[in-house]
């Protein structure tokens, strides 16, 4: 149902706007300019944390309502989840995949000036590969769940995000101010879970509602983390991942339809 897809995407957009604003204010006033240590007594860390909780609750409620609609069919395969106009799928796949790949290339070119340059280069290469895999997935989602390349394409974001989580933790572990990088860690964790849930369509274990919830929540966190200070390539990669998660979950939600026969079809 396209209406449900627009509703949850609009909810995520509004929540992300507030989350980004609060995070930007926190970055501006809650950390000392010289040391980077947190300033005591500020309300903005609590505002950001509260916004994350509110986003999780709102998106969970919207997904719960979608799940409990009577006589509903849920997509149970990758082609069913990605069913859309070939033009829409191609434009989304090429644009978002290219953004992720360009972010990886940017990171690769500037990795020499960053902490752990070797890890940054590997991360950049994975981002380029994941961008190409996403574009391929949107251009040819496959006729069956085990179609050649479908599993690899669905697995690439998982590999990218798992490695990025390791890199982020290694780079930030020396920072005593956990709140300075906590949102990024949460965003990467949520995006990793979202990618895992979406990969279930390719692996024959589809869970449409879980995939939609985690994709929307992870996109919210990725957008909320954008005001943080990071390399330009990583910034573009994070924005591209948010776009990819929103696009995938929009298509999946659009393909939740009234069942043709029987009470409920597909996989919730």
Task: Label the predicted regions.
Residues 12-19, 87-107, 121-136, 151-168, ...:
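Alpha-helical transmembrane segments of multi-pass integral membrane proteins
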Residues 24-48, 106-125, 142-149, 166-185, ...:
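Membrane-helix interface and helix-disruption motif detector
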Residues 20-27, 60, 64-67, 101-112, ...:
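Transmembrane helix-loop junctions and nearby membrane-interface residues
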Residues 1-123:
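N-terminal topogenic module of multi-pass integral membrane proteins
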Residues 4-7, 13-24, 46-61, 181-268:
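C-terminal transmembrane-bundle signature of multipass membrane proteins
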Residues 72-85, 113-115, 138-151, 200-209:
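Membrane-interface helix-boundary motifs at transmembrane edges
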């Amino acid at each position: 149902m396209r209406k449900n897809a627009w509703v949850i995407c609009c909810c995520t957009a509004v929540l992300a706007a507030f989350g980004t604003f609060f995070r930007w204010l926190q970055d501006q006033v809650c950390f000392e300019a010289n040391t980077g240590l947190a300033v005591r007594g500020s309300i903005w860390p609590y505002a950001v944390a509260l916004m994350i909780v509110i986003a999780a609750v709102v998106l969970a409620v919207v997904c719960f309502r979608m799940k409990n609609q009577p006589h509903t069919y849920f997509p149970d395969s990758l082609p069913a989840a990605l069913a859309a106009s070939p033009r829409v799928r191609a434009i989304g796949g090429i644009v978002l995949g290219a953004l992720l790949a360009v972010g990886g290339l940017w990171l690769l070119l500037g990795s020499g000036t960053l902490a752990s340059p070797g890890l940054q280069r590997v991360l950049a290469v994975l981002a380029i590969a994941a961008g190409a895999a996403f574009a391929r997935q949107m251009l040819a989602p496959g006729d069956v769940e085990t179609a050649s390349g479908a599993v690899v394409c669905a697995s690439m974001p998982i590999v990218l995000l798992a490695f990025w989580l390791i890199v982020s933790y290694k780079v930030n572990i020396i920072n005593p101010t956990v709140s300075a990088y906590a949102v990024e860690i949460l965003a990467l964790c949520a995006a990793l879970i979202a990618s895992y849930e979406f990969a279930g369509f390719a692996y024959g274990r589809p869970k449409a509602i879980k995939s939609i919830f985690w994709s929307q929540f992870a996109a919210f966190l990725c957008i909320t983390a954008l005001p943080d200070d990071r390399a330009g390539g990583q910034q573009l990669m994070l924005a591209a991942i948010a776009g990819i998660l929103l696009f995938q979950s929009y298509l999946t939600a659009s393909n939740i339809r009234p069942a043709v026969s029987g009470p409920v079809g597909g996989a919730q």
